[in-house]
Amino acid sequence: MRVKSVYKKLSVSFILVMLSASQEVNSQAKVSVNLNVKHVVGGISEFDRTKYITIHANQIENEWDGDNFTSDLRDHFLNGFDVYLGRDTGGITWNLNNMQEDASRPGFANPSNIISKGINTRNNYASKTHLHVYENRKSNHVVAAQLHPFWTGESQIATKGTGWELASPTATGEYMGRYFNEFYGGNGEPVPSWIEVINEPAYEALGGKKNFTNSLQEIADFHVEVADAIRVQNPNLKIGGYTAAFPDFETGDFQRWINRDKLFIDVAGEKMDFWSWHLYDFPVIGGKEDIRSGSNVEATFDMHDHYSMLKLGHKKPYVISEYGAQTHDFRNEGWSSYRDWLFVRAQNSLMMSFMERPEDIAMAIPFTIVKAEWGFNTDKNLPYPARLMRKANEPESYTGEWVYTDRVKFYDLWKNVKGTRIDTKSTDLDIQVDAYVDGNKGYLILNNLESEETEITLDVFEKYDSSITNILKRHLTLSSNNVVIEEETFSSSISTVQLGAGSTMILEYTFANSLTIDETSTEEKYYADSYLQPIVASQPILFAVNNVVKSATYGEAVLRLGLGRDHGKSLKPIVKVNNTEVVVPDDWRGYDQADKGRFFGTIEIPVSYDLLTTNNTVSVEFPDSSGHVSSVIMQVFNFSSDIRTLSVNDVTASDTKTLLISPNPVKDGMLNMTIPAKLKNPIASIYNVSGSLLIKQSMKHSQTSIPVNLFDKGVYLLVLQDGSKKIGESKFVIQ
């Protein structure tokens, strides 16, 4: 968690301040990686570039062509950075605006005209064979209808080219179904994977971001009728909505949720194949920051999934068809690298949350357009901000050849990442972490939700001791208000890195041999029997989390507690699982949400795996009233073995792992530890929680005892070294 830190427009000065209560000694976050442990969620364990490394574009767009710095921009960008095509809203809308009305059925598109235009479009595409090679980059493509002229309710607008209005949602759906039948397939473009009924219908119709009283009923009904009409023409299309611009559930003490998103699930949920959202950080809005990244986006997913489980009995996938940052305070300014920084910072932070739920995310598309010349503001002489490309002489003048904006650095950073997801763990919730293994390559991704530089201790464990031949460190950060990727190469293991404020780092490890993955961590979420419960002071709120499967002897669990409360109210309740009180952390992902109307976030509470049973009770009690518990979810990780504890026989001089110590807690003044026989010069050090060194001594092999009877009660850290090389560490408690 970080406290509020306003993004500055002209100069940015980041100060090294460690604020997280969960950080280790010396204010360091620690990241642990098990290279041999596969992390499986919903049967998925691979990094799917087709859903994460995307752009809001189609390969047929003319904007790829022109006076570019490279002769073939499609190839340079899509193939060069291994990027996939995300979304198209233009073709379906342009064609409706120029479609003839059916003379015998006023308000309906002429089927014959749809057929003829479809044939022409397919034949035109078939003739452009240079575009066909990119079909493999749109296997997860999204097509969306724009609000106008598709919307048939209040504020309806006629088609621009032909001047007639659609008669009803059924007329809208019939056109869309016929459009996909005639314009795609055969010698045309591949049929898109995901169809959004309409783009952001509530944005202008229901009072904006802060409104919570207007109802989504008409929009929900529209989705039902359109979906039914599409399926009459083509029952195989995947249809979703409502393409929400601001899924701010907590507004109005959750009245916005009740009047909009809950209502949409109730009315249209059974008709939707997926949910469609737009998720943005607002890092500069009236001199303030309104950030969704971190605990807020976690709570948003958790609440929506929880209610879907209660209402529908299952979750549905999400198409995040736009995401990133809206940079309001820069709207009257030209291009700048700093504005691009605000976007890629949000893009990385949000995508890390998406990657944690691979079974739920069908597609995630940052709102980056190729050139967006259609959005040039002629009144202000300003280009559209959300662009991959810019004129070389911007911002001074809109002249020169087309070159990349600094948004390309996101794609440059991620260009090599692929493989099997492996087990990772961070001691600081503000350090997002993920990792993948592909053959002899390992990719460790670190993202900083803090507004301060953070030192991270790395614990990268390779069970079979395959030696490291190379580490490429790539650090996407801000330097003098410019987005940069700092690169550094190492020929052996590194133990710490400095991660810049709001920055992302990818460490690409190369090993001498292919890595063996022979253990698993299988993740599953279990939802309580109720949600959105009001908070009354000193009154426990009871939840049942049933049918939990513990399929292993070893594992971990996290109680995900969604909270919506006014600022100043407690975020640290008394929580009991099966009548046993658990420790609620003071930290959560991201900042304190001070500029938001209220706090809405997920508090992640570690729960002992041994405490879980098949059917569980959870009690939540606050000292003060108001607000709601929005969701209660038990996140369970079943391990194939004890992956958190290192056997003495597995320790080598290159390992950094949890040590075997006993007893813990220490009650008799003596701490016992096992020293691996392979160590040549074992040294043990004990630190307190402030990072002060209390004792450091050479050790003998075999079972060894360290007297700690002179230490006060509390939490300490034991660190074992072999000479100057750190081998492992363990926390222990003195009672």
From Swiss-Prot:
Gene3D superfamilies: 2.60.120.1200, Glycosidases. The active site is at 200 (proton donor), 322 (nucleophile). Coiled coil: none annotated. CDD domains: agarase_cat. It catalyses: Endohydrolysis of beta-(1->4)-linkages between beta-D-galactopyranose-6-sulfate and 3,6-anhydro-alpha-L-galactopyranose units in funoran; Hydrolysis of (1->4)-beta-D-galactosidic linkages in agarose, giving the tetramer as the predominant product. Optimum temperature is 30 degrees Celsius with agarose as substrate. Keywords: Carbohydrate metabolism, Glycosidase, Hydrolase, Signal. Its EC number is 3.2.1.222, 3.2.1.81. GO terms for molecular function: beta-agarase activity. Optimum pH is 6.5 with agarose as substrate. Exhibits more than 80% of maximum enzymatic activity at a relatively broad pH range from 6.5 to 10.5. Residues 1-27 form the signal peptide. It holds the Pfam family BPA_C. InterPro entries: BPA_C (IPR041224), Glycoside_hydrolase_SF (IPR017853), Porphyrn_b-sand_dom_1 (IPR040527), Secre_tail (IPR026444). Agarase activity is enhanced in the presence of NaCl. Agarase activity is significantly inhibited by Zn(2+) and slightly activated by several divalent ions including Mg(2+), Cd(2+) and Ca(2+). Belongs to the glycosyl hydrolase 86 family. Endohydrolase that cleaves the beta-1,4 glycosidic bond between beta-D-galactopyranose-6-sulfate (G6S) and 3,6-anhydro-alpha-L-galactopyranose (LA) unit of funoran, a polysaccharide produced by red algae of the genus Gloiopeltis. It releases the disaccharide LA-G6S as the predominant end product. Also acts as a random endo-acting beta-agarase, which can hydrolyze agarose tetrasaccharides and hexasaccharides, and produces disaccharides as smallest products. Besides typical agarose oligosaccharides, it can use methylated galactoses. An accommodation pocket formed by Phe-367, Tyr-280 and Gln-326 at subsite -1 (cleavage subsite) contributes to the methyl-galactose tolerance of Aga86A_Wa. Docking simulations show that the canonical tetrasaccharide of funoran (LA-G6S)2 could adapt to the active cleft, and the G6S could be accommodated by the subsite -1. This is Funoran endo-beta-hydrolase. The gene is aga86A.
